[in-house]
Amino acid sequence: MRLLWGLAWVFSFCASSLQKPRLLLFSPSVVNLGTPLSVGVQLLDAPPGQEVKGSVFLRNPKGGSCSPKKDFKLSSGDDFVLLSLEVPLEDVRSCGLFDLRRAPYIQLVAQSPWLRNTAFKATETQGVNLLYSSRRGHIFVQTDQPIYNPGQRVRYRVFALDQKMRPSTDFLTITVENSHGLRVLKKEIFTSTSILQDTFTIPDISEPGTWKISARFSDGLESNRSTHFEVKKYVLPNFEVKITPWKPYILMVPSNSDEIQLDIQARYIYGKPVQGVAYTRFALMDEQGKRTFLRGLETQAKLVEGRTHISISKDQFQAALDKINIGVRDLEGLRLYAATAVIESPGGEMEEAELTSWRFVSSAFSLDLSRTKRHLVPGAHFLLQALVREISGSEASNVIVKVSPTLVSGSDSQVLNVQQSTNRIGQVSISFPIPPTVTGLRLLVSAGSLYPMIARLTVQSPPSRGTGFLSIEPLDPRSPRVGDTFILNLQAVGIPAPTFSHYYYMIISRGQIMAMSREARRTVTSVSVLVDHQLAPSFYFVAYFYHQGHPVANSLLINIQPRDCEGKLQLKVVGAKEYHNGDMMKLRIQTDSKALVALGAVDTALYAVGGWSHKPLDMSKVFEVINSYNVGCGPGGGDDAPQVFQDAGLAFSDGDRLTQTREDLSCPKEKKSRQKRNVNFLKALSEKLGQYSSPDAKRCCQDGMTKLPMKRTCEQRAARVPQQACREPFLSCCKFAEDLRRNQTRSQAPLARKVRDMVNLIEEDDILVRTSFPENWLWRVEPVDSSKLLTVRLPDSMTTWEIHGVSLSKSKGLCVAKPTRVRVFRKFHLHLRLPISVRRFEQLELRPVLYNYLNDDKNVSVHVTPVEGLCMAGGGMMAQWVIVPAGSALPVAFSVVPTASTNVPLKLVAKGTLDSSDSVSKILQIEKEGAIHREEIVYNLDPLNNLGQMLEIPGSSDPNIVPEGDFSTFVKVTASEPLETLGSEEALSPGGVASLLRLPGCAEQTMIYLAPTLTASNYLDRTKQWSKLSPETKDHAVHLIQKGHVRIQQFRKKDGSFGAWLHRDSSTWLTAFVLKILSLAQEQVGNSPEKLQETASWLLAQQLGDGSFHDPCPVIHRAMQGGLVGSNETVALTAFVVIALHHGLNVFREGHAKQLKNRVEASITKANSFLGQKASAGLLGAHAAAITAYALTLTKASEDLRNVAHNSLMAMAEETGENLYWGLVLGSQDKVVLRPADPRSPTEPVPQAPALWIETTAYALLHLLLREGKGKMADKAASWLTHQGNFHGAFRSTQDTVVTLDALSAYWIASHTTEEKALKVTLSSMGRNGLKTHVLHLNNHQVKGLEEELKFSLGSTISVKVEGNSKGTLKILRTYNVLDMKNTTCQDLQIEVKVTDAVEYAWSAYEDYEDDYNMPATDDPSVPLQPVTPLQLFEGRRSRRRREAPKVAEERESRVHYTVCIWRNGKLGLSGMAIADITLLSGFHALRADLEKLTSLSDRYVSHFETDGPHVLLYFDSVPTTRECVGFGASQEVVVGLVQPASAVLYDYYSPDHKCSVFYAAPTKSQLLATLCSGDVCQCAEGKCPRLLRSLERRVEDKDGYRMRFACYYHQVEYGFTVKVLREDGRAAFRFFESKITQVLHFRTDTMASIGQTRNFLSRTSCRLRLEPNKEYLIMGMDGETSDNKGDPQYLLDSNTWIEEMPSEQMCKSTRHRAACFQLKDFLMEFSSRGCQV
């Protein structure tokens, strides 16, 4: 009996303990700092009438409160409450959270005396650990277009919102990463309107790839959001090609007999169909994107209404597979690749498209069961939720889904069969009952009937533990919409006699508990949830109860059907559905609240060139960001209550149980089984590529197969491959491909052209001229209150614009409008292409294409509007009448000849009726004949020196000057060297810094964007002179520094080092240079110190045991590392690195950086010891001595070391008067530079020293300033450096400019004074119009007018008078075009450029290098053409870029091949980088694919290339001693005749004056030299040409004295000679006739003219005039402005020149010529003796 009573007592005690009072604590498992945290507190099983008081708060696990306390009061009747806590950002540091980075947890604590007194706790606190995150709010980033060219400006917006999606004003941190993932820009900006707008420029040297703009709240590291955009070179297409397969998949089941079918569509961007031919090819593509060509499937087809259809039968496809030994079963996982090139018939333009998503599959569908719960409730219904998509990714509607569940109950099982069709969005929800005894469920699900997709899923019942289960069943299994009431039924299952009275539930969305409530228990309890915007896009419904002291819980994830935003934003174009270019468009913006609306319009043509991969911001992206705050994992449910809470994103504690502490923000990934694929197909994909297994070997093989744009044997190519492992596959595959393409040929067919006649016209003034063609516009933010009507002018592009809008409202948050499209189109319009540039008197053929989409044929008049400087038919007013058939296009040809020396606006007009007129205006870029020559001279102005108060500057008399050119002398005078150099646009503006150095560049030269501006900013900061400049100057300077920083990051490697090119290994010297400059720029660019610390760490790893530094890959120009070889080179490099590390010390801060700082300081000390030893040995050259002395002084090395280095340096100084410099010393590498002669008097120009001398003296000046301050020696060194600057303030190259500006800035800061000094300079020159005088009043503090730039005649002597008490500088810049290059030094460097016709080159190469689409475009594409060979079609995409295909048949003749050869004199010690700058023949552009082959393959021939207008720049690591040639193709899109020779220059990168310049011409007998003009166009072009008179032959008598009237009245000639022509010579675009004077009739300036002397007479090659040798002529005209190499005048023969062939003695003896001969002799006698009596 006692035993029974005892057992009863124990049982009652346990029961009471299970039902003991509890405090339940709920919250999201993640705390976002600075944002509210919802906390649910519930009192459970408390006796009636009992009241519990307490508080909740957040604290550091180590102690210390992190949030204010929130009180609560609970009772049995009011037993739960939802509170809000927050960790203020300002308290994060004080509560010690930042010290817990490795364990980022915070504790949620409930505190109440009740816990200890009544709940039997040891303490009065109960808590749970939460993960904390600095993420808060929402950020969205938007760019103005999805794709950019390198060099383009990117406009972007950042929208900042708080946790509730409302506008937030805060500091934002913006970062930009390039395609290599390296950060190139970082800035912090405060946004006051929640919409930040800013811009940055992509460096022009950027490699193709995906860039990223990221934004975050500055105090929230994890709030980062980003957007991506593409960077690549592209041209906006005129039309778009689309490939649409009939099915988005290809079934690879053996029984499938369907044909493979696809449609090709080509439409102009404005929506109209394209006429032309489509060429299509196919390949198999694996997961890595590698393609294997399917021979025999290539097709060509005519487009009908812009469409064509391609069908491949099963047998055709199988035959293609058989050729490469591939079976149908091997196709799984592969894709069928299709590429189409369309050539339009009217204009011959080509566009391409490719299809890469066409998969081989075993089923047409994919099946997603991720929304199906993994736990079932025995005795309740189970809900299977599936999403069925087509292989393309779109929802599959009305697809039968069959479910065969196997119910497992112990060892028994039962199979059911259920089926249902998917709804319109591909969803299906199937519910079926589960018997109470079932413990598991095996699901077999199939989608589709014929070839179904099958998925399997196993579902288990959670262990009951005797507490039963909770079933949650939605009344309607479909996803609700915002505004719906969603009903869920709750039922306790497996509990015989429930002991609880209520179900409790929570709604969790966006990482917060949105609601907490309870519902009284009934047999079936229904809960209604009103779905509002705050629950979108998904929420968890979590319900629970306690039974016998144990929690029972379940949850369900409910996805809300996508809908528009909380507010309203609609964009609607009012009025016409279609607009004309230039029309005023009305855009209606409608909102439902006061909002800011950010707009933007994008040309949809950008999507055609790859922009679709980066879609614009839309609501799906917005919901994706919102949903990212949902910290729940899975579809709901769990093994037990804590797991249910945890998977729903909750942290939970009831005193006895708690959820596991969350480790990170992400969910654990579900393991997926992956079927093994048959790997045998890899060998079968390609007989050749399959021989190589490693990716590197495969790449080498592919490189070998790729054709070069020049002739090289495979053995020659392989010899250039540096890696031995790469050489064998490269050679083998090269020979393999060479055999395949050996005998390929092509045919061509002419393009027929039509011209027709006549109609009634409208006035030309009524035709809108199209001139504006942006890629995006309407980038603006508009305040809108409910509605606003914007009226904007549409750009001139004929395209479809997509208008985007994003609104931000304080009451409704962010909303993204559905884009609206506006088609801008003229049913009749013209399209015109112009060449990059042409030269004067070259003949240009314009070929505008007229497009007529009207229903009627149109009679149209087409003409070019008259403009001065352009010869056209009828002076431009003669029109061509054509009939453009309805629905077609017609090209029209015009010949024009530019005669102006400046750019000409060219306006083309098509005049018809009101609906058939159009006009386009473009600028024709005109280049002058010959090549540009620059000459710079510097004079020192010192009025205090009596000998220097007067000086004369002689004019230039270069015999090579092009006549009638713009040749002038520019004079710049300044009295303020510091402000002129460092306060001018040259140092503080983008255009100015570009003018400092006119060189293009690699990584080192890129630093010129940073260094001068940094130096200038430092000078103006230190001397407080920003106020003397315009207010925006400092902003410009900061922008320029940031731009330079972005640019240099393109060369950064992942380890922090830098190389001259991305493909080149890192350089110690260059990395040190960048470290130094970026350390100084830290404040302006906001660069991460960690990045610079990586750079410094890399440098430390390059230090050797003796303290010196070595360079694993020296910069290309070795001389710039110290000017000397051997030990001097090592010394200079070590000193350079020491200087860089010293400047980098300021970026080493707390933590790890302190250790790195100690390492850097130790490294500097070690290096200084090495430098001191070398300086003590006394064997250093001047440059190494100077940089060593500066490094030791800068780093404050021991005094002994500094003194030794100083004495060694001063022993090498050269002192001349007021100047001190360091020049050539024994051991210098630069033996070709001679010492400049000291000026004999102050009136002579300052001798210009080489770059190395300037850099050496600059380092010496920096050393002297640190050692002695502003002393005499520093004054003299600064004086010498000051007068070495060029016209724009720079010096010879990058390094000497950077170091010298640094040195002079330091000197000018030390010598800055407020004392004002004045300088008066008087310049006078005698010109054609008499004496020209300028008086300049300057002072040393002038800003506006700190310098005067004047223009004088090139040949005039300039007299200069100097007065005042201030020194100054006078700089001369002469620029003019020269006829030939005979005056340039080509003894050391040599360059040769040869241009050959493409056909000639192809035959000589024994193969057709114009592979792929070089096919004729005809008016009737159905005319049989020679088919394209498989290899040619397949190689097409690799060998050509967009718009590099021939446009019409005859343009094949306008394709040429360039061969560029370079070499140097073997005795020349030049080992540095050189640049070949080739100016292309007019109208040509280089084929970019050819240039890329020279730089990107394993056998690299060129380090880098750039194209700039008509220029192609090729970078060579070095110039070989033997002749080395590279080649590339060029295409002339616009026909040009009488093409003039162009120039090419090879120059040393660091000494640009060390160069070789040559001219080259078009191929002889080429159509490029043919005459295109006819009739009056030729007459106009020759209007300035001289005419040869043969008066005697035409029996014209001089009765009225027309010779005398011409000489004295019409023109009043300035010279008159009879001459005998000796020889003819061609130079550039001129013919030279060297002639001997036989009689002097008259002269004005040619005072030395006498009988027997020779003179040169010049005529343009475009003129027909030919003077025959050994014949005598009478020539009279105007004086020339040029002289020959003897200083004698040269005369240009033009329309104002009298040229008459003198009759022979025999002719004058004849009777019929006797009178005329006497008249001629009388004129010669009278004019020579009396001249003009006027």
Curated annotation (Swiss-Prot):
Positions of the record's site feature: Cleavage: 753-754
Signal sequence segment: 1-19
CDD domains with a match to the protein in the record: ANATO (cd00017), complement_C3_C4_C5 (cd02896)
Keyword Membrane in annotation: no
Boundaries of every NTR domain copy: 1585-1732
Residues excised as propeptide: 674-677, 1437-1443
Subcellular location: Secreted; Synapse; Cell projection, Axon; Cell projection, Dendrite
PTM statement from Swiss-Prot or TrEMBL: Prior to secretion, the single-chain precursor is enzymatically cleaved by plasminogen (PLG) to yield non-identical chains alpha, beta and gamma. During activation of the complement systems, the alpha chain is cleaved into C4a and C4b by different proteases depending on the complement pathway: C4b stays linked to the beta and gamma chains, while C4a is released in the plasma. The alpha chain is cleaved by C1S to generate C4a and C4b following activation by the classical complement system. N- and O-glycosylated. O-glycosylated with a core 1 or possibly core 8 glycan.
Sample GO molecular function, one term: endopeptidase inhibitor activity
Keywords: Cell projection, Cleavage on pair of basic residues, Complement pathway, Disulfide bond, Glycoprotein, Immunity, Inflammatory response, Innate immunity, Phosphoprotein, Secreted, Signal, Sulfation, Synapse, Thioester bond
Cited InterPro entries: A-macroglobulin_rcpt-bd, A-macroglobulin_rcpt-bd_sf, A2M/Complement_sys, A2M_N_BRD, Alpha-macroglob_thiol-ester_cl, Alpha-macroglobulin_TED, Anaphylatoxin/fibulin, Anaphylatoxin_comp_syst
Domain Anaphylatoxin-like, first and last residues per copy: 700-734
UniProt keyword annotation of Transcription regulation present: no
Sequence position, cross-link Isoglutamyl cysteine thioester (Cys-Gln): 1002-1005
One term under GO cellular component: axon
Residues bearing attached sugar chains per UniProt: 224, 743, 859, 1128, 1383
One GO BP: innate immune response
Major localisation: secreted
Domain of life: Eukaryota
Coiled coil residues, start to end: none
TM ranges: none
Residues modified to Sulfotyrosine: 1409
PANTHER family from the UniProt entry: COMPLEMENT C4-A-RELATED, MACROGLOBULIN / COMPLEMENT
Function: Precursor of non-enzymatic components of the classical, lectin and GZMK complement pathways, which consist in a cascade of proteins that leads to phagocytosis and breakdown of pathogens and signaling that strengthens the adaptive immune system.
UniProt subunit comment: In absence of complement activation, circulates in blood as a disulfide-linked trimer of an alpha, beta and gamma chain.
Name of this chain's protein: Complement C4-A
Organism annotation: Mus musculus (Mouse)
